[in-house]
Curated annotation (Swiss-Prot):
Function: Involved in the biosynthesis of germacrene C, one of the most abundant sesquiterpene in the leaf oil of tomato. Produces mainly germacrene C, but also smaller amounts of germacrene A, B and D when used with farnesyl diphosphate (FPP) as substrate; able to use both (2E,6E)-farnesyl diphosphate ((EE)-FPP) and (2Z,6Z)-farnesyl diphosphate ((ZZ)-FPP). No or low activity with geranylgeranyl diphosphate (GGPP). Can act with a low efficiency as a monoterpene synthase with geranyl diphosphate (GPP) as substrate, thus producing beta-myrcene, limonene and terpinolene.
Pathway where this protein functions: Secondary metabolite biosynthesis; terpenoid biosynthesis
Organism the protein comes from: Solanum lycopersicum (Tomato)
MF (Gene Ontology): germacrene C synthase activity; magnesium ion binding; myrcene synthase activity; terpene synthase activity
Protein name: Sesquiterpene synthase 9
Length: 548
C-alpha cells in the first residue's frame, strides 16, 4: 500500500543559489555599424578565397576545417556544401595525397560531417596484414590527431575505426606528455582533442578554444583569424543582448524568491540552448526555448525536490488539461509556475499564428505533457513504498524524463525555416537519433548524479535498476552505460548519412543537443553544481571578448 505523503518530509535538495543573479541585465551593448561593415568586408574576402581555392586540393580541406572550427562556417554554408560535394564526388579517383594519413583522415571527417558516406576502407592502406595500424605512423603527430578525430565519425561495426581510436588515443596520450613547451600549440590541441573530440564539441566552446590554438599555429591565415575574432566578439554582443532580455523576464517573474527550493539557472539554461543553435537567425527560437527550459527546470525540481505526492497529482492533472481554469486546483505556491508555463506557449501561439505555423505549438505542448507524465510516473514509483521499477520499464520512462525529446521538438518551434508535419511526427515518434540523444543525456546524467539523488530520496535511477535486475556492481554498471553512450553516438552518426529522413538542420539541432549533454555531464553534473567548470565556460563565451 502506498505510504501517505503526509508522513513524508519534503525531499529538499539544497541546491546552491544562482551564480549569476541578474548580472546580464546591464549587457545592452549594440553592435555598431562600423563592426558590421568590417565583418562584412572580411567575409567577402574569405568567401572569394574559399571559392577560388581548388576543391581537390589539401589547401581547400584545411581551409574548410579551419572555418568550421573557428566558428565562421555558418557564413558560407552554400559554398562549403558545394565544395564538399565536389570533394566527395572526386574521392573515388586517384589523388596525389592518398597516402598521407593527415589528408585522408581530414577528407574522411569533413565528408562524413556533411552527411556523405565515405567507406572506412580508405584507411586500410595504413594497416598491416593483421589489421593493426603501422607503427611507423606514430611519428606523424598531425596524422594521428587527424585520424583520431575521424574515428569519432564511426558507425556500428566499423572495426578499422575502432582500432584507429584505440591506436591514436594510446599514442597521443603518450605524445602529449612528452611534447616540449616549444610545441605548446600542438600540445594544447592534442590535449583538447583527447578531452573533447571535435564531433562532441559545442560549436561556440570549440571556436573560443580553437581561435587561440589557430593563432599559435605558424601556418595560420591571418585574415581568417582576424575575421574569426571579429565575428566571435560581434556574436558575443548579440548573445549578451538576448541574455539581458531574458534576465529581465526572469527578474520580473521573481521565481528565485518564489521557488527557493529549485535550481535558479537562467544563464545556464541559455548556455544550454546556445549550444543547440548560436547563429543570429535563430534568435527568436533561442529565446523561446530558453524560457521553456528554465520553466522545465523549475517543474522538474518541484517534482524531485519539494512537492508531496498529493500536490503532484493535481499539478500533473492541471498540466495535462493545459487550461487556465485548472489553476485553482493546484497548490498556491505552484500557480506562478503554471501560469508562466501557459503564458510562454501562449506567446508562441500569438507570434506563430501570424506566420501560419500554429501547429508547431501543438506538437510542443504534447511533448511537454509527455515529459511531465514521465516525471509523475517516477513520483508514483517513489510513493509506492520506494518501488524500484524493472530496468526495461525505467529505461522507457527515463529516456522521456531526460527532457531531450521535448527539447528536440520545442527547439524547432521558433525557427523560420519550413518544417513539415511529417518532420514533427518523426521527432515525436522517438526516431533513432532523438532516442540516442536522450539515452546519452540520461545515462551520463545518472552516472554522475545518481548517488546524490538517492541521498535525498529520489526514484531509482537507471543505475540502481540495472544493478538490482542484473546483479551487477556499480562499476560494471558504469561500464555498461558508457558502452551504451558510445553506441548511441554511432547511431547518431549513421542518421546523418544521405539521404536523410528529415532536413539536415533538424539533425544538427539534435547533434548539438547531444554535445551539450556530453559537455555538462562528462565528469559531474555541472548544471546542478554550476560554480566551477560551467561558470568558466559561460565566462569564456558570454563575458570575455577575444583580444583582436
Amino acid at each position: 500500500m502506498a505510504a501517505s505523503s503526509a508522513d513524508k518530509c519534503r525531499p529538499l535538495a539544497n541546491f546552491h543559489p544562482s551564480v549569476w543573479g541578474y548580472h546580464f541585465l546591464s549587457y545592452t551593448h549594440e553592435i555598431t555599424n562600423q563592426e558590421k561593415v568590417e565583418v562584412d568586408e572580411y567575409k567577402e574576402t574569405i568567401r572569394k578565397m574559399l571559392v577560388e581555392t581548388c576543391d581537390n586540393s589539401t589547401q581547400k580541406l584545411v581551409l574548410i576545417d579551419a572555418m568550421q572550427r573557428l566558428g565562421v562556417a555558418y557564413h558560407f554554408d552554400n559554398e562549403i556544401e558545394t565544395s564538399i560535394q565536389n570533394i566527395f564526388d572526386a574521392s573515388s579517383k586517384q589523388n596525389d595525397n592518398d597516402n598521407n594519413l593527415y589528408v585522408v583522415s581530414l577528407r574522411f571527417r569533413l565528408v562524413r560531417q556533411q552527411g556523405h558516406y565515405m567507406s572506412s576502407d580508405v584507411f586500410k592502406q595504413f594497416t598491416n596484414q593483421d589489421g593493426k595500424f603501422k607503427e611507423t605512423l606514430t611519428n606523424d603527430v598531425q596524422g594521428l590527431l587527424s585520424l583520431y578525430e575521424a574515428s569519432h565519425l564511426r558507425v556500428r561495426n566499423e572495426e578499422i575505426l575502432e582500432e584507429a581510436l584505440t591506436f591514436t588515443t594510446t599514442h597521443l596520450e603518450s605524445i602529449v606528455s612528452n611534447l616540449s613547451n616549444n610545441n605548446n600549440s600542438l600540445k594544447v590541441e592534442v590535449g583538447e582533442a583527447l578531452t573533447q573530440p571535435i564531433r562532441m564539441t559545442l560549436p561556440r566552446m570549440g571556436a573560443r578554444k580553437y581561435i587561440s590554438i589557430y593563432e599559435n599555429n605558424d601556418a595560420h591565415h591571418h585574415l581568417l583569424l582576424k575575421f574569426a575574432k571579429l565575428d566571435f566578439n560581434m556574436l558575443q554582443k548579440f548573445h549578451q543582448r538576448e541574455l539581458s532580455d531574458l534576465t529581465r523576464w526572469w527578474k520580473d517573474l521573481d521565481f528565485a524568491n518564489k521557488y527557493p527550493y529549485a535550481r535558479d539557472r537562467l544563464v545556464e539554461c541559455y548556455f544550454w540552448i546556445l549550444g543547440v543553435y548560436f547563429e543570429p537567425k535563430y534568435s527568436r527560437a533561442r529565446k523561446m526555448m530558453t524560457k521553456v527550459l528554465n520553466l522545465t527546470s523549475i517543474i522538474d525540481d518541484t517534482f524531485d525536490a519539494y512537492a508531496t505526492f498529493d500536490e503532484l497529482v493535481t499539478f500533473n492533472d492541471a498540466i495535462q488539461r493545459w487550461d487556465a481554469n485548472a489553476i485553482d486546483s493546484i497548490q498556491p505556491y505552484m500557480r506562478p509556475a503554471y501560469q508562466a508555463l501557459l503564458d510562454i506557449y501562449s506567446e508562441m501561439e500569438q507570434v506563430l499564428s501570424k506566420e501560419g505555423k500554429l501547429d508547431r505549438v501543438y506538437y510542443a505542448k504534447n511533448e511537454m505533457k509527455k515529459l511531465v507524465r514521465a516525471y509523475f510516473k517516477e513520483t508514483q514509483w517513489l510513493n509506492d513504498c520506494d518501488h524500484i521499477p524493472k530496468y526495461e520499464e525505467q529505461v522507457e520512462n527515463a529516456i522521456v524524463s531526460a527532457g531531450y525529446m521535448m527539447i528536440s521538438t520545442t527547439c524547432l518551434v521558433g525557427i523560420e525555416e519550413f518544417i513539415s508535419h511529417e518532420t514533427f511526427e518523426w521527432l515525436m515518434n522517438e526516431s533513432v537519433i532523438v532516442r540516442a540523444s536522450a539515452l546519452i543525456a540520461r545515462a551520463m546524467n545518472d552516472i554522475v548524479g545518481h548517488e546524490d539523488e538517492q541521498e535525498r530520496g529520489h526514484v531509482a535511477s537507471l543505475i540502481e535498476c540495472y544493478m538490482k535486475d542484473y546483479g551487477a556492481s556499480k562499476q560494471e554498471t558504469y561500464i555498461k552505460f558508457l558502452k551504451e553512450v558510445t553506441n548511441a553516438w554511432k547511431d547518431i552518426n549513421k542518421q546523418f548519412f544521405r539521404p536523410t529522413e528529415v532536413p539536415m538542420f533538424v539533425l544538427e539541432r539534435v547533434l548539438n543537443l547531444t554535445r551539450v549533454a556530453d559537455t555538462l555531464y562528462k565528469e559531474k553534473d555541472t548544471y546542478t553544481n554550476a560554480k566551477g567548470k560551467l561558470k568558466n565556460m559561460i565566462n569564456s563565451i558570454l563575458i570575455e571578448s577575444v583580444k583582436i
